[in-house]
């Protein structure tokens, strides 16, 4: 593991324990929660996201927000902490399901709609016009995906393929992109040859295009290119905190 990643994981744990909202842990929590939720249509701003993480409240002058956006933002903070708590565990179906539970257990709308929380989907769903795995096939396809992944020498290409296949299966009723991107961050933290990154909302179109390229042509070039771009951005942001 690189010196940078050892430093990063250590700072995450120390700053979380101290409730430090001024370091790289808080930056990563806010940046990842904001961007990953924004990609999925969240209306919350970076300022609102920071206020929720720092204080558990929205700015006093805010007169509009969607309850679901707030609930999912808080759920994302919890999912990130669960990810940190399980870094030494193997990536399994149960671990992924628990990530989904942390993200979605407090979302009223999903519960009211009867969505499975912390479990695979019970109803078919689509990505635009693309048909994803049927509910009856999800468990088999997820097992095959994880079995394949654990046999591979880890690289950005393998990680991109894993992510694209995961999103094509779309194992949950909702929250697939956010759990998938959290898995990306996790696997980059724990694998020696990978570097962590956050997919930014400003690059949403490139990201969607990369997933589409894999679905249609089984190619990962666009996703890998984007991931390498985001690696540089995240490292640049983290360097600011390395001088304390």
What is each residue range found by the language model?
Residues 1-244:
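FIC/Doc superfamily catalytic core
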């Amino acid at each position: 593991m690189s010196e940078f990643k050892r430093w990063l994981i250590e700072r995450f744990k120390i700053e979380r324990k101290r409730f430090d909202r001024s370091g790289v842990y808080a930056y990563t929590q806010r940046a990842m929660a904001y961007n990953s939720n924004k990609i999925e249509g969240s209306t919350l701003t970076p300022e609102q996201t920071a206020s929720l993480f720092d204080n558990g409240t929205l700015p006093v002058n805010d007169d509009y927000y969607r309850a679901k956006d707030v609930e999912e933002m808080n759920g994302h903070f919890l999912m990130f902490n669960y990810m940190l708590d399980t870094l030494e565990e193997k990536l399994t179906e149960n671990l992924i399901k628990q990530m989904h539970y942390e993200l979605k257990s407090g979302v009223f709308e999903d519960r009211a709609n009867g969505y499975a929380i912390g479990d695979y989907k019970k109803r078919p769903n689509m990505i635009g016009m693309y048909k994803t795995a049927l509910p009856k096939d999800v468990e088999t396809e997820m097992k095959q995906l994880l079995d394949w992944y654990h046999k591979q020498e880890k690289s950005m290409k393998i990680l991109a393929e894993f992510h694209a296949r995961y999103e094509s299966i779309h194992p949950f009723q909702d929250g697939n992109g956010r759990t998938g991107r959290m898995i990306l961050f996790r696997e980059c933290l724990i694998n020696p040859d990978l570097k962590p990154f956050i997919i930014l909302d400003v690059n949403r179109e490139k990201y969607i295009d990369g997933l589409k390229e894999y679905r249609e042509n089984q190619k990962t070039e666009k996703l890998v290119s984007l991931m390498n771009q985001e690696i540089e951005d995240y490292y640049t942001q983290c360097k600011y905190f390395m001088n304390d």
